[in-house]
């Protein structure tokens, strides 16, 4: 086999391949990664680099003992919205629950009004700023949902803005759009059946026809959609080639996880109220469990998703920020990793794999979330030498260099400094 000709090399690194198992980050000390174009061409011992790779013309980054991982895959976000809900946050700090606030006119309805009133340019600029904050922390793939328009014209508008987001970022991250059914529009609450029927007959086919979304997601919850309504929406989406996903068991045990298993969804996300039957259903169907600990923290709850039970049952798991204005107003990757360890019971290695390979699996993107020959060259050099350090020094951005498709897209001002103690 001829030697690959590298265009980019990261050497003197601790490489985490994240391609072994959910509990094994695949650490390779004293390693290097060679990139050819947009793909990983070689991974191995640093001392073997010159013999096995033609790196004479490559850009070389000396990791100085730092950790190199796959680019993070944020598999659950709501980046496109307008307005704020700081007043609602204060109400919850005073003891009101999320559902109580929503039933009194707050919640998604507040964001829907602001989003509908905002011009496209504002929505795009705000979403791009949020995405840039994620990229600067090592995220190279972002799933982005619609969901705050609620009615068909507004949902189509939001999905078109999500498509523009990829161009606005200049290819610095992969953007994967999702049509989200968040709630019945206020104009149609008197005839829910008509809304579901019209969505299945018109909105979903148009989204599929115009290729505006890869996924279709439904919020299965009291006050949102019942399992039977979600089943109709998701089956219509599947029939049109969209990949189904669900928000499940976040605030109540609503049967969303079992529905996800029944329909073969790519993922069931949240799961704070998941019971043993739901765990078993996800395990049997091999549906990815999407863990979103920032939401649990933000809502002031101590009832986190049963991550250990899920892993022990063989359920694949992903980890994501769930950045949104109502239940997780944060793009903090470091805090997400730390919460996964402190509150979900994951090891640092498990948290890292969940945020890389797990996210890729939730989005059905096999070339993402791992470092292996032929995989996408999405890489991060961190200012520390281990997954443990990433989770231990919490809520800090440790990303020094972020690479997307073999191109450096972000470099921290302190990129010369690596703390590998």
Curated annotation (Swiss-Prot):
Q: Which InterPro entries match?
A: Amidohydro-rel (IPR006680), HutI (IPR005920), Metal-dep_hydrolase_composite (IPR011059), Metal_Hydrolase (IPR032466)
Please write the reaction equations for the catalytic activity of this protein: 4-imidazolone-5-propanoate + H2O = N-formimidoyl-L-glutamate
Cofactor binding note of this UniProt entry: Binds 1 zinc or iron ion per subunit.
Query: What's a BP term from Gene Ontology annotated to this protein?
Result: L-histidine catabolic process to glutamate and formate
Predominant subcellular localization, coarse grouping = cytoplasm
- What keywords appear on the UniProt entry? Cytoplasm, Histidine metabolism, Hydrolase, Iron, Metal-binding, Zinc
Question: What residues bind 4-imidazolone-5-propanoate, as annotated?
Answer: 85, 148, 182, 250, 327
Task: Please report a single Pfam family linked to this protein.
Answer: Amidohydro_1
Q: For N-formimidoyl-L-glutamate, which residues are the binding ones?
A: 148, 324, 326
Pathway linked to the protein? Amino-acid degradation; L-histidine degradation into L-glutamate; N-formimidoyl-L-glutamate from L-histidine: step 3/3
Q: Where does Fe(3+) bind?
A: 76, 78, 247
Q: Which residues bind Zn(2+)?
A: 76, 78, 247
Gene Ontology terms: cellular component: cytoplasm
According to its UniProt record, which cofactors does this protein need?
Zn(2+); Fe(3+)
Listed disulfide bonds for this chain?
none
**For this protein, what is the EC number?**
3.5.2.7
Q: From the Swiss-Prot or TrEMBL record, what is one GO molecular function term?
A: imidazolonepropionase activity
Q: What class of enzyme is it?
A: hydrolase
Subcellular location as annotated: Cytoplasm
Q: Which family does it belong to?
A: Belongs to the metallo-dependent hydrolases superfamily. HutI family.
What does the record give as the function of this protein? Answer: Catalyzes the hydrolytic cleavage of the carbon-nitrogen bond in imidazolone-5-propanoate to yield N-formimidoyl-L-glutamate. It is the third step in the universal histidine degradation pathway.
This chain's protein is named: Imidazolonepropionase
| Organism of derivation | Anaeromyxobacter dehalogenans (strain 2CP-1 / ATCC BAA-258)
